[in-house]
Design a protein with these regions (language model features):
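Intrinsically disordered, low-complexity Ser/Thr/Pro/Gly-rich regulatory segments
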Residues: 1-237
């Protein structure tokens, strides 16, 4: 992956490499059943994002109970029960990470786990999660001017080209997200790099559909593993 960056953007800073080590992978695997449950019931979970955010900001706890859905978090202890299916686990990362996970990070981990199978099959290589990269030349940073960073939700290679994916579990309202996805993909991967918008919902408004088409972004909203593999194979031809 660093080969792409050194070739196309040699002066850009890599703040977070996005390499998932064995310990981090274990944590993702521990949460896999929860990520699967959240995806299965995403229509009910996603509208709760704002309430979850507000609750956590107020007391660093989450306590929601309605319509056969219970969600509890306090002091790293997690309990989610949806229609009688209950998952309990201890979230041992830093305190704010579970909030990030439950309001969208779970979908990134869900897609990451899907792509692990393509990694095993050697359809893709060098899979990364949550890379953070400088979008300015480090030489331009002077005095108190702070660098601007871009986060790549998921990045991988097919052995030849860079692929960057933006994962959206909630409604996409800002066209700027698509512009940033396209721009950053080209900066770090060159003209042949591919960008993918991965969404939990197939409903894109007219304006966003046009933007996706103009920017040549592949939109995938179901059968993620299969559709990503097909996209890679078609791109190789």
């Amino acid at each position: 992956m660093e080969t792409f960056f050194s070739l196309h953007a040699p002066n850009r800073m890599i703040k977070q490499k996005g390499i998932i080590d064995e310990k981090s992978l274990e944590k993702i695997q521990e949460r896999k059943n929860l990520s699967n449950l959240l995806y299965e019931h995403r229509v009910r979970i996603i509208p709760l994002y704002q309430r979850i955010n507000d609750s956590y900001a107020k007391s660093e706890t989450i306590n929601i109970c309605e319509n056969n859905l219970k969600m509890f978090y306090r002091d790293h202890q997690v309990c989610v029960n949806i229609d009688g299916k209950e998952i309990k686990l201890r979230y041992s990362e830093d305190e704010d990470d579970f909030r990030k996970y439950i309001i969208g990070g779970w979908f990134e981990e869900y897609i990451y786990c899907e792509l692990l199978e393509l990694l095993d099959k050697q359809v893709i290589y060098d899979l990364r999660l949550n890379m953070i990269l400088g979008v300015e030349n480090t030489n331009d940073i002077q005095g108190d001017k702070r660098p601007i960073y871009a986060e790549l939700d998921i990045a991988f290679s097919d052995g030849k080209n860079l692929y960057v994916a933006e994962c959206k579990s909630g409604e996409l309202q800002n066209k700027g997200v698509l512009t940033a996805l396209s721009t950053n993909t080209q900066i770090f991967g060159g003209a042949n790099a591919k960008c993918i918008l991965i969404s939990s919902d197939g409903n894109l408004g007219q304006g966003l559909q046009e933007k996706v088409k103009i920017l040549n972004i592949k939109f995938i909203f179901k059968d993620f593993k299969k559709n990503i593999e097909n996209y890679i194979n078609n791109s190789r031809r």
